[in-house]
């Protein structure tokens, strides 16, 4: 609801603006504070906001794909929920692909 409200206010004040929403990376499944279903629900809520002028970069899906071949420590700086250099590169790549598409 808060994100929807923020997007609505931006679009109201700046109707020609475009908004990029970013669904976050996954946290470590072994850590109690980052259950996977939480990230999928958040991504799905953001997807419901996609409309003309509002786009989504689905880093949740990118992380799911990466974790099929890599370990959490390959993507994170702390092994839990903060991307390392490679993880930040994935974020930048996702946003740039959207902008350049």
Where are the regions a protein language model picked out?
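N-terminal cationic-hydrophobic initiation segments that often serve targeting/anchoring roles
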Residues: 7, 11-12, 47-51
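Alpha-helix N-cap/loop-to-helix boundary motif
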Residues: 1-2, 38
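Catalytic His-Asp segment of secreted/periplasmic serine-dependent ester chemistry enzymes
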Residues: 24-101
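A short helix->loop->beta-strand "cap" motif at the edges of active sites that frequently abuts
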Residues: 12-19
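Generic structural signal for well-ordered alpha-helices
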Residues: 3-8, 43
């Amino acid at each position: 609801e808060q994100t929807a409200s923020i997007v609505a206010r931006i679009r109201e004040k700046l109707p020609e603006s475009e908004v990029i929403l970013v669904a976050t990376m996954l946290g470590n499944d072994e850590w109690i504070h980052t259950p996977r279903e939480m990230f999928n629900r958040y991504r799905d809520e953001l997807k419901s906001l996609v409309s003309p002028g509002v786009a989504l970069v689905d880093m949740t899906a990118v992380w799911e794909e990466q974790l099929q071949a890599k370990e959490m420590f390959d993507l994170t700086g702390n092994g839990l929920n903060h991307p390392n250099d490679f993880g930040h590169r994935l974020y930048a790549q996702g946003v740039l692909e959207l902008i350049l598409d």
